[in-house]
Amino acid sequence: MTKMIPPVPTAAAAVMMPTPKQKIGFSIESIVGNDVSTAGGNSTPDLSGPQSPPPGERNVPGSPPQTPPATLTLIPGSPPHHLMAPPAHGLPYPHPHAQQQQQQHLQAPHPHPHLSPAQQHVLHQHLLMQHQHPGTPKSHQDIQELLQRLHHNAAMASGLSPLQTRLSPETEQPQMAVSLKRERSPAPPAMEQAENPAQRIQPPHTPPKSVSPQSSQPSSSPTLLISSPHATPPQQQQQQPPPNYPKPAMMHPGGAGPMMMPGMPPAGLVRPFPMGPGGPPMPQGQPGLPDIKALPPYINAPPELPPQHNPHLIAAAQFQMAAALQAGHVLGPAAAAAAAAGLPPHAAQFMPNPGMARDSYQLYPWLLSRHGRIFPHRFPGSFLVPPFRKPKRIRTAFSPSQLLKLEHAFESNQYVVGAERKALAQNLNLSETQVKVWFQNRRTKHKRMQQEDEKGGEGGSQRNMHNGSGDEDDDELIDMEMDECPSDEEHELDASH
């Protein structure tokens, strides 16, 4: 005889219970909870066919959870009545001695949940065949041998952990449910029905086996249903701890990872500029670290700053993007000088994402041209035109007719201003700025040609070469005044001569 061990429900008890067939019929007494005599067990309507067993047999593991009759008193250490074996000799309930023996079978060290679904199905068919032949009395030794054989096969087949599905609960949740459930006294089934209204209303519901095998657990078992949300009683919702869903990094104030947003770099790379008195304070310098003021504004941002503590994060990111697109009109002198020098060799360890700054240098090549320069506060970025504005300049292509009319206007008057310049621009389909810049370049070229003629004479090729070099200087001077217009039109004149 196996040693009696008090039943300790495990997580496998909620996983491995089979659901061989979905039974539809249930008795009104099991719903209402009225007193039912032990001889009146045949009141359940038989809706599952002629081969369906009586109600005493229907409550095997795998049937929908039903409430035992009120006259049956539950023993504190015993499983519910629908975990017991079918009754002998066609009686609705077995003999008390047979109950004790069957409890010993169920309280073996390896209970039913450790069997595979196929082995449990074999045991279920064996019990059904014995019940269909009431003339042959059932031998408990045969049942015990069958159980031992199945346990041995299950132990030899798989020494692994019990089957875990995607919807299976964590191992801590059944433990908590057991500790809260076992302290309750064995209340009558009517009180259990009042406490668990959800299971009383929906007893015949059995989800598919592939989704939630533990849904066939009985209503009075300590491990409750977990995978089916609509059959969960309110008491179980109070017992279950909140599920540990993966939370994003922005929900943890002390999290190590910065907040990632779709159209923005990480939070460690974005920091508003200290433009006004209401801006964030500058971080203090630490001994042994390089000077923070020497780094670009998106490198020296402290990565441990939580994003939710900075209410101006999104506005600062938009401001920095706009400042970068305006080619440095808003950058301060120290930040511009630091960005000009590029990344120092020791700056990679202070950057949360080193690849982001490299991509930003590719996006904004004007940062690379400000190498080692110091600029005063009051001058905008357009003061720095000569080093980096040349490659981006779009050259205005004048037509021969426009050049001819401009030359005639220059011969008559070298200074075209006011209404005359406006009329000439409208006549040539040009802007006033283009006309003004062309006249400035033409006057500069005329002066240089006069100076070279007075010096007595060098070749025309050398003169054109000097004029080209002088035009570059004039272009730089004029382009600082007229930023919106290109000023290389004089090269067209040199090509036309």
UniProtKB/Swiss-Prot annotation:
Record field: compositional bias (Acidic residues)? 470-497
Q: Residue ranges under compositional bias (Pro residues)?
A: 51-68
Q: Supply one GO CC term from the record.
A: nucleus
Q: Where is this region: Disordered?
A: 34-117, 161-262, 441-497
Comp. bias intervals (Low complexity): 96-117, 208-239, 248-262
GO BP: any one term: embryonic development via the syncytial blastoderm
From the Swiss-Prot or TrEMBL record, what is one GO molecular function term?
Answer: RNA polymerase II cis-regulatory region sequence-specific DNA binding
Listed A to Z, the keywords are: Developmental protein, DNA-binding, Homeobox, Nucleus
Stated consequence of mutating H131Q: In strain: Berkeley and Oregon-R
Q: Where in the cell is it found?
A: Nucleus
Question: Which InterPro entries has this protein been placed in?
Answer: EMX-VAX-Noto_Homeobox_TFs (IPR050877), HD (IPR001356), Homeobox_CS (IPR017970), Homeodomain-like_sf (IPR009057)
Q: Where is the composition biased (Polar residues)?
A: 35-50, 161-176
Q: Which residues bind DNA?
A: 391-450
Protein family membership: Belongs to the EMX homeobox family.
What else the UniProt entry mentions is:
The sequence shown is that of strain canton S.
Q: What does this protein do?
A: Acts as a homeotic selector gene controlling antennal and mandibular segment identity.
What's the name of the protein?
Homeotic protein empty spiracles
Q: Which organism is it from?
A: Drosophila melanogaster (Fruit fly)
